[in-house]
A protein has these predicted regions:
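Small-residue helix-packing motif on alpha-helices
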Residues: 31, 41, 74, 192-199
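Rossmann-like NAD(P)(H) cofactor-binding subdomain of soluble oxidoreductases
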Residues: 38, 47-48, 56-129
Length: 213
């Protein structure tokens, strides 16, 4: 049976977990979640119906370790798991480079860095996937499958990851501004606020689908 260990099950870690479970990529009995405390680990495990990891030792036998923690927490997590020689590590921590990840892990560990964006939480994200030096084609395909469950993805160089991350990461904020402006205009001409927001959002959503198709 597959074993997956997720460090950090907040907004993005939770989106990855929920999306992969919903798409049937993972089974609940395969998943272990590790938070900053045993209590938090148990709470998140209970919320998603998965296992709680108390000390991260599951990294030793895990098929995949996902780092979904804040960048300042990453060094401690890498130190914690490196002694277990994890086979594959996927990090979504912003600004933590492949060089830093690979340098802190055993030489044989396959590493991939991913930059998702917030719409992943509703299954419409855009993720940039940058494979490390040792990442196998099979691991790259696995990363593509995971983030396809959350929207769209693209395999890029690490430099392109930062560039695409800036575009898709900041992009939703600009879209929100446009939606608000359109909704305000709708209210000014007499529409109820709720209807104006819905119409504005659907208009942008439809336009985006036309571009993609």
């Amino acid at each position: 049976m597959k074993k997956i260990l997720i460090f950090g099950c907040g907004a993005m870690g939770g989106a990855i977990l929920s999306g992969c479970l919903a798409k049937g990529l993972w089974k609940k009995e395969e998943i272990y979640v590790k938070e900053h405390s045993e209590e938090a680990s148990r709470e998140k495990a209970s919320r998603y119906g998965v296992h709680a990891s108390m000390d991260g030792r599951e990294a030793k036998e895990a098929d995949l370790v996902i780092l979904a923690v804040k960048p300042n927490v990453v060094p401690g997590v890498l130190q914690e798991i490196s002694r277990y020689h994890p086979s594959r590590v996927l990090s979504i921590a912003a600004a933590v480079t492949l060089e830093a990840l690979e340098g802190a892990l055993p030489e044989e560990t396959e590493v991939i860095r991913v930059m998702p964006n917030t719409p992943a939480s509703v299954g419409e994200g855009m993720a940039a996937i940058a494979p490390g030096k040792k990442a196998s084609p099979d691991f790259i395909r696995e990363a593509e499958e995971i983030f396809s469950a959350l929207g769209k993805e693209a395999v890029v160089t690490e430099r392109q990851l930062d560039e695409l991350g800036a575009l898709s990461g900041a992009g939703p904020g600009y879209a929100f501004v446009i939606i608000d402006a359109l909704a305000d205009a709708g209210v000014l001409i007499g529409l109820p606020r709720k209807l104006a927001i819905e119409a504005a959002a659907q208009t942008l959503y439809g336009a985006a689908k036309m571009v993609l198709e």
